[in-house]
């Protein structure tokens, strides 16, 4: 410490200067270090973003390595609000309830996986909150309905945005009618400091046309720490509406409706090839998620030799059926899926779990599921 300077270095700082390094969640591989600038934060929270417009008292539970830390810290503080830190290593539904009662917490951010888990464990734990922000993954429509019915006075915002766009690129305050949208809960319109482009062959797709979701604006990161080639690939400069525009390519697929609302359709890079067929795991997830007795599910490719894939594996958490009976066992679930899906999409491995694994940032950990297939003979006890 004695060797360190005692005065400010006097380096010039502007909106593009690095402010923090955040890490991606690593749900499908190794976390990447993302360099985020000052304007990425200030443009979002100084721009009248609705959940932070009234000096909220917000739960601050995200680790500082994740951009959720920025949301929970600067969101309230730059708007005259307060941060409340929970005691203990893990946030539990009872802790959230206690913080609302004791410390006046009125706003909280939970990943979709944690939001679902809290609703399953204790649907009343959100009592006293005026606003809940969630997202990062596809929301469960039945759980959203449960929240809206039990907490009609509370706002529920679905936020979408990779770490590379600093917290959110779009957001939508969910309304009951959103639960009836065929493609799932919409992910909204751009938040302050961001623009969204749905591109097909690097051209803007029209309303209702599927394309890759790309983001531009002040919210973009400078790039990946010490990885210039990846930065160049994921943050290209394209000509959009006649202007050269730096964008972040999310790899997600979606479309904008006639009102400009963005709808998420899935990942564009999860496609795998199995026995000559190109397969979208999300198609299987959507079919399983629509069945009575399936609470959560995830589909991952079964690792084969030489980086090939031998088939699909479905992991799910069972729920009670509408008539109160137990949810399907793996064999019954696979039989049902076989009546709904083409043969090459029917998972060869089906496993029931009490809970699906989560990363440190609270998102579904697909890598852990794949690793479990590598650790054990995936034919033992499976279909």
Which residues does each PLM region occupy?
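AMP-dependent adenylate-forming
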Residues: 1-11, 41, 155-158, 173-383
């Amino acid at each position: 410490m004695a060797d360190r300077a005692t005065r400010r270095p006097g380096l010039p700082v502007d909106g593009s200067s690095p402010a923090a390094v955040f890490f991606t969640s690593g749900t499908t591989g190794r976390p990447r270090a993302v360099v985020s600038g000052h304007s990425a934060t200030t443009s979002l929270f100084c721009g009248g973003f609705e959940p932070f417009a009234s000096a909220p008292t917000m739960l601050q539970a995200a680790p500082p390595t994740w951009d959720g830390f920025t949301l929970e810290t600067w969101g309230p503080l730059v708007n005259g609000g307060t941060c409340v830190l929970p005691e203990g290593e893990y946030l539990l539904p009872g802790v959230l309830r206690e913080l609302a009662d004791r410390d006046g917490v009125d706003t909280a951010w939970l990943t979709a996986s944690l939001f679902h888990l809290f609703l399953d464990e204790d649907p009343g734990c959100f009592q006293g909150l005026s606003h809940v922000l969630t997202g990062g993954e596809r929301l469960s429509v039945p759980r959203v309905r449960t929240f809206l019915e039990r907490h009609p006075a509370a706002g529920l915002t679905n936020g979408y945005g990779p770490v590379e766009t600093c917290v959110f690129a779009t957001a939508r305050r969910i309304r009951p009618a959103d639960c009836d949208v065929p493609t799932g809960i919409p992910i909204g319109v751009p938040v302050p400091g961001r623009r969204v482009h749905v591109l097909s062959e690097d051209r803007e797709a029209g309303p209702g046309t599927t394309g890759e979701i790309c983001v531009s604006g002040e919210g973009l990161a400078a790039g990946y720490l010490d990885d210039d080639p990846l930065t160049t690939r994921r943050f290209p400069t394209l000509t959009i509406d006649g202007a050269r525009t730096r964008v972040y390519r999310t790899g997600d697929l979606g479309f904008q409706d006639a009102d400009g609302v963005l709808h998420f359709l899935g990942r564009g890079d999860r496609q795998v090839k199995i026995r000559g067929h190109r397969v979208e795991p999300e198609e299987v997830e959507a079919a399983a998620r629509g069945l009575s007795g399936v609470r959560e599910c995830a589909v991952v490719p079964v690792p084969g030799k030489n980086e090939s894939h031998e088939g699909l594996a479905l992991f799910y958490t069972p729920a009670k059926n509408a008539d109160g009976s137990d949810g399907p066992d793996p064999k019954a679930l696979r039989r049902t899926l076989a009546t709904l899906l083409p043969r090459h999409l029917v998972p060869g491995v089906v496993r029931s779990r009490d809970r699906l694994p989560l990363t440190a940032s609270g998102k579904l950990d697909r890598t852990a599921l794949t690793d479990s297939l590598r650790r054990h003979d995936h034919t033992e006890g499976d279909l």
